[in-house]
Swiss-Prot record:
GO terms for biological process: transport of virus in host, cell to cell. The lineage of its organism: Viruses, Riboviria, Orthornavirae, Pisuviricota, Pisoniviricetes. It comes from Blackcurrant reversion association virus (BRAV). Keywords: Capsid protein, Host cell junction, Transport, Viral movement protein, Virion. One of its GO terms (molecular function) is structural molecule activity. Gene3D superfamilies: 2.60.120.20. SUPFAM superfamilies: Positive stranded ssRNA viruses. Virions are comprised of 60 copies of the coat protein. This is RNA2 polyprotein.
Length: 1626
């Protein structure tokens, strides 16, 4: 402000700038309002923006002499800015800067002020500024004043500790300098403090959460430790109980029969005598040797040996021929191996045995030749062929006589008895001076080298049988464990490889001595395997003996050297064989480990599954538990009882010694009571020659599992990451799943369901202690079945989706796949509904806001991968209530495919949960219909089955859903995070190929299959796409407007618009997004034969039109027209005929239109019957057909009393099951028969006409067959389709008849008035059901005159006297007030269902009112009943549909012995002259006769019974599979397969056949003139056959096509028949 107070302006942007003018305050406001200045007082010119300064004049103070100049203005500004009192000027932010010069800063203008006479305190923020008074107001000192006397009062002194706080002098504390902050700085400090406070609160909350989690983890760990302790106790208890149970079962004794006891007693006596004889012979031999020790040597004579005819061993009757080991031609060098079963013993077992035997013979011969005093017969050991070793030769029959006299061998005049397989070689040698104990060293025994197969029966005998091998293993002096390989070929050089080198290489695997042996170089294998036997020294070793006393010869531990060969290929082949049989490899590995521990070789370890041979052992029983193997091995000898070894059919075997003593023998497996890992038997109880031992329980044989291994099948168990038990007695207890059932009856089952199996840690003291500990534990256990805590977090995204890796994160941002787990619903209630009625509730997939966000991100589709549904039942626990919850796709109209996956939920278990995989994708767009699909595309359908009568409409349960979704940006996105392996999702569930993966309280599941068969893609007609724009009109010479003189208005000239403006051409739209052009509101096909678009559209679908006439007094059954479908189309050669010729084999659909003038009084009803296989034409005589016979086929009724034009759509593909070819018939000529159903109530005045039109609405090229009508074995779906008509029935005027009935024996034949019996396809189909319950659905059609009317009441009654109308009104029924209409009646019987073969249950029709007619009328009320179907009410019907084998025919009373006849493979009737044929009448036979054609596979089984006696071997039967014509005169045929059996020994023969000719299908009558497959039966003793039954066994998916009838003569009724033309009247 200036001193003068005038308004000045700062220089502006130029001379015209507004800032150069003078502004007053008012003028300034006006300028801002008018826009001359901006609102903030700046120049509005571009590039200027100068600010206007307005100064205001103030009143100057008057100048007085006493006015003083202000010396300092420090009080006006902060002290730090003062130039006088501060060291230097400071900036507002507090930083000291350099001192400013006075010139740089203008002096502030002095302000007027008053004299300050007091101190002024100014508070600025936290500061208090005190300004002292500028003018003193002290009073002047009085001049003559007398000083007053002042009395000083002494102040009492207080100690410091008694003084108050305000009296205590406080030291002065230097207060730091307080800075004056601006508002921005204060706000910044405040924000900083708030931020620090918020972070502090967050850290505290985080620490609190961490501490809570740590505490929870500690609690869980403690709980888990307790659970594991209890689990260990439970497992120990289970094992103890299982072991005790197993021992109790093993201790059970199976009683022996008398014949078995006699055989055991006689065998024991024979063995004792044999042992005594052996001991006597040894004593004589030793005595003789001592007597001749001093005599000179005597030369040997020629050795004479005789074959042992029958050994004295207890197994002699089994057909084994055991001989000695002398080198004579009569020697059985195989030791009975030629009688073995080749299917049981492997080749590699027999080859070394035979080679060892031959080598021993050679060694004995060489040793005898080395003795000069010993003479040896010059004989050669016969070579044993492999065919003999493998048991190709048939075993001999059972010995009738048992020879107990041992044969003797003469050598040097001394006879030596030959006892069993033991041969003692005595040599005449002076140097032989040994002790009697050394006799056994020169005894070669092979009793432990031959494995003998037997049928063993476990001690529990009645439970099951097991196949194993009783035998003895090798005991060779060899410590090396490797595989023997043959010599290399000539010219092949390679580095020598030793077994030690093989073991050092990782790619090779060594085998034990019981591994595979080479078949090409047996001698080299024996050389390495038996080095002691083939050595040149005289120290002969033995193979068997007590204690394995082989200390006479030191063992050679040097690794044997094998000649070089192609080890790489040989060893790899050996490894491959072991991989193919891992069970054998595992046994070899265990055996190798046991041998390293210097265990006895005969004490081989064997797995428990070998001893029991059981695929499934469960204790306690659990669902879906199967034991695959046990890795705990028994280190003990197992002994088998003698009577088990012999045979299980012991009653048919002659005892060795009749009348022998009774010997009580135990028939059980002997297991030691001590732990199996520490107890094993000694050799002292085993006799090396006999191979058996005696104890208090009987005689037992030692068991070796060595030969069992190669042939034991390995059971395959389908498990998903399943950990099986690793101990022996844990029989079938594995990890629990949420599918485990809840059974509270047994505490052990509850323990098993709640606890997981773990390894044994601590023993359990007693079962009472275990129960008491379990009663104190928590009720919520991880993984439990009933009390499982199923919250929304039980399944995580990691279990469903892959986590993206580093490479996935580096992908382009455009290709991103999002996954989410949305908890969409939580408390959706489902209310109880009636049985059979569905309840639809939503399954929301996401919210509208979530969908909007996904659309903004550019996502294009969403997939529902997994759906976790948790259910909280409101039904009281334990109640029998089941709900079927089904996830359905609302976009699919067919309920069969709309149902994705469903589960049967037990609502009496409080909680339930199911995890399913819908695997459905929805598009995401902004269209309204697509948005609805995304949000509500899935729906939950619930059906209830309640026996408690829970209130309908009451909430039954609540459910919540957790949905795992995957979102993709586009259809081109190949990146998916869904796990490909569903096992990772299923985890411990055993359903890798099912959409229902988990669940508890779930009784069962139903889901769509992943791999469903694809349908046949039918032919389509390709058309060009529609135009996107309408027709564009162009103007060549446009009209121009001339300029008018006036501009006020002008007139448009007349315009002659052309007619072809294109307005008639519609704008093309896409109707339903799939169809062709749409003209107007109707679809139209462009004209094919027209040259101009005239707008006239002809009816191109008309295929046939013809006028027929009817007599005025036509009766029921009169045939008006018989239309041949394949010929009528070509009568006029319309467009339909040409299209059919172009398509060839085609599928079509007709609209049949009948035009008759409507007349309500005549009372004529027309019937139309479709005969697709030409079965009714032979039954039409004199243009009359039996109406009940026509009612068995698809029929439609048209009463002319209602209207004059009738239209009915007929789908021939659905009725006939096949498609048609023009002119030529395939399986039949389809016909449409039009006839009169009921008589005229009133005769017409004259003949009347009827127009029949056929419009072909569909014509498509197709294959021969359509969908099958029925597939066997048939899985009944619940509804039984009938489509049968009954009637016509009449109620006469006057109320004479008040009740009519028709029986519901649907499966019976129908007897017509012409004496024919007919069986329809629905009746034959009903024969597969013994009974059916539910409701009957049908319709009553009025067929008479409209002048007569009445009211009807319908009900169903079972057995007893027919109910009256008053009683029927109490039953569940249906009222028809107009006398016609549809009805739905519940079937009530004492058994819950009705029989399809007996007339006990009937449908009763009562006259509820009427009939009423006008006075001249005297006709009755006529009607027909249409039985549509039987609807199941939930109870499963009694069915025989699972039976596959049916009898087709029986032949007896053959005329001659040599007969030959053919059996067609098309299930036709047999007409034979060689015997009497009786064709069976069963459901299969009636279905074959009542269907059009069929195909599939079957097995023809021929069984016969003869007049021959047992043992007669007469006659043969030959069954030949042929191809050709059965009735061919020349007999030209091709024999494909032949089979010949004995007539008396074999009672049946079968052959697998494919039903069908060159078309792939077959008819019972066959195709005339074409080859077919048939069986030819021939025999030369036909008169000896009493009965010959021909049975057929259907294979899976045997298909039947088409529907027709079987017209049979009424000779022998097949079932209880009813008359359809004469109903029961009362």
């Amino acid at each position: 402000m200036s001193e003068s107070g005038n308004t000045t302006s700062m220089p502006g942007c130029g001379r015209m700038c507004a800032l150069r003018s003078t502004w007053s305050k008012r003028a300034f406001l006006v300028a801002c309002k008018d826009g001359a200045l901006t609102s903030d007082g700046r120049c509005p010119q571009y590039g200027c923006g100068a600010l206007v300064s307005i100064t205001k004049g103030v009143q100057q103070p008057k100048k007085t002499a006493s006015a003083k100049v202000v010396k300092c203005l420090c009080w006006v500004q902060p002290a730090r800015w003062c130039e006088k009192h501060s060291k230097g000027p400071a900036s507002p932010n507090g930083s000291v800067t350099t001192k400013r010069s006075n010139s740089a800063r203008a002096a502030p203008a002095p302000l007027p002020y008053k004299k300050q006479t007091c101190d002024v305190v100014v508070t600025v923020g936290p500061l208090e500024l005190v300004y002292p008074a500028l003018v003193s107001e002290e009073l002047p000192t009085p001049v003559a004043a007398t000083p007053t006397k002042v009395e000083e009062v002494p102040i009492p002194e207080l100690p410091l500790w008694l003084a108050p706080a305000w009296m205590v002098e406080q030291p002065y504390a230097a207060t730091p300098e307080v800075l004056c902050l601006t508002q921005r700085e204060e706000f910044a400090l405040l924000k900083k403090r708030l931020t620090r406070k918020g972070k502090l609160l967050q850290r505290r909350a985080t620490h609190a959460r961490f501490e809570a989690r740590a505490a929870l983890a500690r609690v869980r760990a403690a709980t888990q430790r307790k659970v594991e302790e209890v689990t260990a106790l439970v497992i120990k208890g289970r094992r103890i109980l299982a072991a005790h149970q197993l021992l109790r079962e093993l201790e059970e004794v199976a009683p022996l029969s008398q014949a078995q006891e006699q055989l055991v007693a006689s065998s024991c006596a024979a063995a004792a005598a044999r042992q005594e004889e052996c001991a006597s012979f040894l004593r004589r031999a030793k005595a003789w040797r001592k007597s001749i020790s001093a005599t000179p040597p005597v030369a040997f004579a020629t050795a004479v040996a005789s074959k042992v005819v029958s050994a004295t061993m207890p197994w002699a009757h089994l057909g084994l021929s055991l001989g000695g080991l002398l080198a004579v031609p009569t020697l059985d060098g195989t030791l009975g191996a030629k009688q073995w079963n080749a299917k049981t013993i492997a080749t590699w077992v027999l080859k070394p045995v035979v080679s060892c035997v031959q080598s021993v013979h050679a060694k004995v011969r060489d040793w005898l030749h080395s003795q000069p005093e010993v003479g040896v017969t010059n004989t050669k050991v016969p070579l044993v062929l492999p065919e003999v070793c493998l048991g190709v030769l048939s075993p001999p029959s059972l010995s009738e006589e048992i020879v107990d006299n041992p044969q003797e061998t003469s050598q040097s005049g001394i006879w030596h008895p030959e006892m069993g397989v033991r041969n003692i070689y005595v040599f005449h040698d002076d140097s032989w001076e040994t002790s009697p104990e050394e006799d056994e060293n020169y005894t070669y025994t092979f009793s432990r080298q031959c494995g003998i197969p037997y049928l063993l029966v476990e001690g529990r005998g009645a439970e099951e049988r097991k196949n194993t091998i009783l035998g003895w293993d090798f005991s060779l002096h060899n410590d090396g464990e490797f595989e023997f390989l043959p010599s290399p070929e000539e010219g092949y050089t390679k580095e020598l490889v030793t077994p030690v080198a093989l073991e050092e290489e990782d790619k090779y695997s060594t085998a034990s001595s019981c591994g595979f042996f080479s078949l090409d170089d047996v001698s080299s294998a024996i050389t390495i395997q038996c080095p002691g036997l083939l050595s040149a020294d005289a120290d002969v070793h033995f193979f068997d003996g007590p204690g394995y006393r082989c200390s006479s010869r030191p063992r050679d531990f040097r690794p044997p050297v094998v000649r070089g060969c192609d080890y790489e290929s040989r060893v790899k082949a050996s490894i491959q064989r072991k991989i193919e049989n891992p069970l054998q490899e595992r046994f070899i590995t265990v055996l190798r480990e046991k041998r390293k521990k210097n265990k006895k070789k005969e004490f081989h370890s064997f797995s428990a599954c070998f001893a029991f041979k059981r695929k499934q052992i469960q204790w306690p029983p659990t669902p879906n538990e199967m034991v695959n193997e046990w890795e705990e091995y028994c280190i003990a000898q197992a002994w088998l009882p003698f009577e088990v070894v012999v045979t299980d059919e012991i009653e048919d075997v002659t005892p060795l010694y009749p009348g022998g003593r009774d010997y009580n023998c135990n028939s059980q497996l002997l297991f030691p009571l001590a732990p199996l890992s520490t107890v094993y038997c000694d050799d002292s109880c085993f006799h090396p020659n006999d191979g058996w031992t005696t104890d208090g329980n009987g005689k037992h044989f030692r068991l070796s599992p060595q030969f069992v291994l190669p042939d034991v099948p390995i059971p395959i168990v389908h498990r998903v990451t399943r950990q099986l038990p690793q101990f022996l007695y844990d029989l079938g207890i594995g990890d629990l799943t949420c599918n485990s059932g809840y059974q509270a009856e047994n505490l052990q089952e509850e323990i098993q369901e709640r606890m997981e199996d773990r390894s044994e840690e601590k023993p359990v003291p007693s079962l009472d202690t275990l129960i008491s500990k379990l009663s104190k534990r928590s009720t919520k256990v991880k993984g439990a079945g009933e009390n499982r805590y199923a919250d929304r977090h039980s399944l995580t995204e990691k279990a469903i989706f892959h986590q993206p890796g580093a490479l996935s994160r580096m992908r382009s941002g455009k290709e991103k796949t999002i996954v989410a787990a949305n908890h969409n619903s939580d408390q959706i209630s489902v209310r109880m509904a009636e049985c059979g009625k569905p309840v639809f509730t939503p399954l929301p997939r996401m919210s509208d806001e979530m969908l909007r966000k996904f659309l903004e991100k550019g996502l294009g589709s969403t997939s529902t991968v997994a759906l976790d549904i948790g259910i909280q039942s409101h039904i009281p626990q334990g109640m029998p209530t089941v709900a079927f919850v089904n996830v359905m796709d609302t976009r699919i109209e067919d309920p069969l495919y709309s149902s994705l996956c469903g589960s049967y939920i037990d609502l009496g278990r409080d909680r339930a949960k199911t995890l399913c995989l819908p695997l459905v994708n929805f598009p995401m767009s902004k269209l309204a219909e697509d948005v609805d699909d995304v949000l509500n595309g899935l729906m939950l359908c619930t059906h209830f089955q309640d026996s408690t009568k829970f209130g309908v409409g009451k909430p039954a349960f609540q459910y919540g859903t957790l949905e795992f979704q995957e979102f993709k940006p586009s259809a081109y996105s190949d990146f998916s995070r869904v796990r490909d392996n569903w096992d990772a999702i299923a985890k411990q569930q055993n359903t890798p190929n099912d959409r229902i993966l988990a669940g508890f309280s779930v009784l069962g599941a139903v889901s769509q299959a992943y791999n469903q068969a694809l349908p046949v893609f039918k032919s389509v007609e390709l058309v060009a796409p529609p135009k996107r724009k309408p027709v564009v009109a162009t103007f060549q010479n446009p009209t121009t407007l001339g300029r008018s003189n006036t501009t006020r208005s002008f007139r448009m000239p007349t315009m002659d618009l052309p007619r072809s403006t294109g307005r008639d051409a519609p704008i093309p739209i896409v109707h339903r997004r799939n169809n062709n052009d749409v003209h107007g509101f109707d679809e139209a096909t462009p004209a094919r034969f027209s040259t101009c678009d005239s707008g006239l559209v002809a009816d191109t679908t008309l295929a046939f039109a013809k006028m027929y006439q009817c007599k005025k007094d036509a009766k029921a059954g009169h045939v008006l027209a018989t239309i041949d479908i394949q010929e009528c189309v070509f009568e006029d050669n319309r467009r339909v005929a040409l299209d059919w010729l172009a398509h060839g084999l085609a599928s079509f659909k007709y609209d049949l239109q009948l035009t008759v003038d409507s007349n309500p009084f005549v009372g004529v009803t027309l019937g139309i019957t479709v005969d697709a296989f030409d079965r009714l034409l032979p039954q039409i005589s004199d243009e009359v057909i039996a109406v009940p016979l026509a009612f068995q086929l698809p029929t439609y009724l048209f009463p002319i009393s209602k209207k004059g034009t009738f239209t009915q759509t007929i789908d021939f593909a659905a009725i006939a099951g096949y498609n048609f070819f023009p002119h030529v018939a395939a399986f039949g000529r389809p016909k449409i028969i039009v006839y009169i159903v009921s008589d005229n109530d009133l005769p017409a005045s004259d003949t009347w006409m009827c127009l029949v039109e056929l419009h072909m609405t569909r014509l498509e090229s197709s294959t021969l067959a359509c969908s099958p009508t029925l597939v066997l074995p048939q899985a009944f779906g619940g509804d039984l389709p009938l489509d049968l008509w009954r009637g016509p029935y009449t109620f006469p005027l006057g109320g004479g008849t008040k009740r009519l009935s028709t029986s519901l024996d649907i499966g019976t034949s129908t007897t017509t008035v012409s004496g024919w019996r007919t069986v329809s396809f629905p009746a034959a189909y009903a024969l597969f059901l013994q009974g059916h319950g539910g409701s009957l659905v049908g319709e009553v059609v009025h067929t008479g005159s409209a002048a007569v009317s009445c009211a009807l009441h319908l009900c169903i009654s079972f057995g007893g006297a027919p109910p009256t109308l008053e009683e029927a009104l109490v039953f569940p029924g249906f009222r028809l007030p107009s006398g016609e209409g549809k009805f739905h009646i519940k079937v009530q019987t004492p058994y819950g269902r009705l029989s399809t073969l007996t007339p006990d249950c009937a449908l009763y029709v009562y006259l509820a009112g009427g009939p009423i007619a006008v006075a001249p009328m005297s006709v009755p009320y006529q009607f027909c009943i249409h039985l549509e179907r039987l609807v199941d009410d939930g109870a499963p019907p009694r069915t025989i549909g699972l039976i596959r084998e049916f009898n087709w025919a029986t032949i007896n009373n053959f005329k001659s012995d040599d007969i030959t006849f053919a059996i067609p493979a098309r299930l036709s009737d047999l007409v034979l002259t060689c015997g009497d044929v009786t064709m069976s009448t069963n459901p299969l036979a009636l279905l074959i006769g009542s269907c059009g054609f069929f195909r599939g596979n079957l097995t023809v089984v021929l069984e016969w019974a003869t007049f021959l006696k047992a043992g007669d071997k007469e006659g043969t039967v030959q069954l030949t599979t042929c191809r050709g014509m059965i009735n061919n005169v020349k007999g030209v045929r091709n024999a494909i397969q032949k089979k010949v059996v004995n007539l008396s020994l074999v009672g049946s023969v079968s052959r697998y056949l494919n039903v069908g000719d060159f078309t792939g299908f077959a008819q019972s009558g066959g195709q005339v003139g074409y080859d077919e497959i048939f069986l030819e039966f021939s025999t030369n003793k036909a008169k000896q056959i009493r009965y010959l039954n021909i049975n057929v066994e259907l294979d899976e998916n045997f298909e039947l096509y088409g529907r027709t009838i079987i017209p049979l003569k009424n000779t022998a009724p097949a079932f209880a028949s009813t008359s359809a033309s004469a109903p029961n009247e009362s």
